[in-house]
Amino acid sequence: GSGKTTMMKMINQLIEPTDGNIYLNKKRIKDHHQRELRLETGYVLQQIALFPNLTVAENIALIPEMKGWKKEQIQEQTKVLLEKVGLSFEDYAHRYPKELSGGEQQRVGIVRAIIATPKILLMDEPFSALDAISRKQLQDLTKQLHQEFKMTTLFVTHDTDEAVKLADRIAVLKDGEIVQVDTP
């Protein structure tokens, strides 16, 4: 209701702002080439968006393949990142999403979002549908990965405790307007 998801859609050019501008690296979003902007943006959504007909490894490989990475490079980076999120390559690479728990699917979604080292990571209430234990584990993991990869992350949540735990800066939205920005 406050405009969080709409803001995310404007950042990746799914919809255009009706008023004002959004800037990324001092350049208006609408002046960025749409395909390049989207290839440089990682996404982790509340509704885990893995392709059911693709294996874990195939889901993760999508963006690197579009960027022209070599197969060996994709496989090596997939191994490294799956291990970082607590999933062994040997046990998970050839599984399908339906064979994973919700928390495991979201871990795969995080790997898919960061494998190509995007400039910006958009996370739209990614943990709200998970149980409390998985949620805490993934919050801790997100914080660790953010510190390691140093990518700009826009994390949308309605949970103020989660915002305080994960954010360097917090923006509060009301009726589509930013009403406050501060550090936690």
Segment roles from a protein language model:
Residues 121-124:
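Catalytic Walker B motif of ABC-type/P-loop ATPase nucleotide-binding domains
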Residues 95-100, 104:
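Conserved ABC ATPase signature
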Residues 65, 72-91, 144:
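Conserved ABC ATPase "signature" region
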Residues 117:
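Conserved catalytic motifs of ABC-family nucleotide-binding domains
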Residues 12:
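Helix-to-loop junction immediately C-terminal to a conserved catalytic motif
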Residues 181-182:
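ABC ATPase "signature
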